[in-house]
Swiss-Prot record:
Part of the 50S ribosomal subunit. Forms a cluster with proteins L14 and L19. The keyword Cytoplasm does not apply. The lineage of its organism: Bacteria, Pseudomonadati, Pseudomonadota, Betaproteobacteria, Burkholderiales. GO terms for biological process: translation. Residues 133-153 are annotated as: Disordered. GO terms for cellular component: cytosolic large ribosomal subunit. The keyword Transmembrane helix does not apply. GO terms for molecular function: rRNA binding; structural constituent of ribosome. One of the primary rRNA binding proteins, it binds directly near the 3'-end of the 23S rRNA, where it nucleates assembly of the 50S subunit. Pfam families: Ribosomal_L3. It comes from the Bacteria. It comes from Burkholderia orbicola (strain MC0-3). Gene3D superfamilies: 3.30.160.810, Translation factors. The modification N5-methylglutamine is found at Q153. This is Large ribosomal subunit protein uL3.
Length: 216
C-alpha cells in the first residue's frame, strides 16, 4: 500500500554514466498529479488517495464528476486513479495537493503498469514463439500451422488455455523492479531504466516495487 503517480510515456532515449556507460531509459511525464479525494476508514471503509492526471474539457465531464471535482477544488483530469495507502501517509495529504516526481528518488525500484501495444490477430509463431515446420522434405502447406490442438475421442475436446492463434497485445501489463535512473524535477520527468509497456503517449501507473527488499 504505497502512493504512486500517473504518467504519460514520452518515449525512449539513453543517458550516460560518469564512466561512459550507455543506459537505455524510458521518459515518463508525471506532471500535475492532483489529489481529488482522500478516503478514510470512517467514511469509505478503507484508506486511499484519489488523484487526477492530465486535462479534460468541461463539456466532456459528467455532472456528478464535475461536482466531485468542484468539491475538491481540482481541475478535471483525463484519468482518475486511486492508490491504497496507510492512514499516516493519507493524513499528510489534502484535497488539491500536487504530488510530484519527488515522490521517488534515484535508484529506487518501481513497478510500472501500462497497456501493451496491440498487434492484431497473430499466429502462434508470433504470439507464443512456436517453432515453424520444416520448409522441405515432404512438408507442404504446413509450414506455420500450430499442429494438433486436441486428442481423440477421449477427452474429445480442446483443453481450456490451449495456446492458439488470436488477438495479441492490447492488454494490461506490469513490469516489476525497474530502476529510476534519473529525475528531472524541473520538467517533472522520470527516467526509468529499461522499457515499459505501451506506445508513446500511453498512460502508465508508477508505484514503489512490492517484490524488492527494502522497497519504499
Amino acid at each position: 500500500m504505497s502512493l504512486g503517480l500517473v504518467g504519460r510515456k514520452v518515449g525512449m532515449t539513453r543517458i550516460f554514466t560518469a564512466e561512459g556507460d550507455s543506459i537505455p531509459v524510458t521518459v515518463l511525464d508525471v506532471s500535475d498529479n492532483r489529489v481529488t479525494q482522500i478516503k478514510t476508514v470512517e467514511t469509505d471503509g478503507y484508506t486511499a488517495v484519489q488523484v487526477a492526471f492530465g486535462s479534460r474539457r468541461a463539456s466532456r465531464v459528467t455532472k456528478p464528476l464535475a461536482g466531485h471535482l468542484a468539491k475538491a477544488g481540482v481541475e478535471a483530469g483525463e484519468i482518475l486513479k486511486e492508490f491504497r495507502i496507510d492512514a499516516a501517509k493519507a493524513a499528510e495529504l489534502s484535497n488539491g495537493a500536487v504530488v510530484g516526481a519527488d515522490l521517488f528518488e534515484v535508484g529506487q525500484k518501481v513497478d510500472v503498469q501500462g497497456v501493451s501495444i496491440g498487434k492484431g490477430y497473430a499466429g502462434t509463431i508470433k504470439r507464443y514463439n512456436f517453432s515453424s515446420g520444416r520448409a522441405t522434405h515432404g512438408n507442404s502447406r504446413s509450414h506455420n500451422v500450430p499442429g494438433s490442438i486436441g486428442m481423440a475421442q477421449d477427452p474429445g475436446r480442446v483443453f481450456p488455455g490451449k495456446r492458439m492463434t488470436g488477438h495479441m497485445g492490447d492488454v494490461t501489463v506490469t513490469v516489476q523492479n525497474l530502476e529510476i535512473a534519473r529525475i528531472d524535477a524541473e520538467r517533472k520527468l522520470l527516467l526509468v531504466k529499461g522499457a515499459i509497456p505501451g506506445a508513446k503517449g500511453g498512460k502508465v501507473f508508477v508505484t514503489p516495487a512490492v517484490k524488492t527488499k527494502g522497497a519504499k
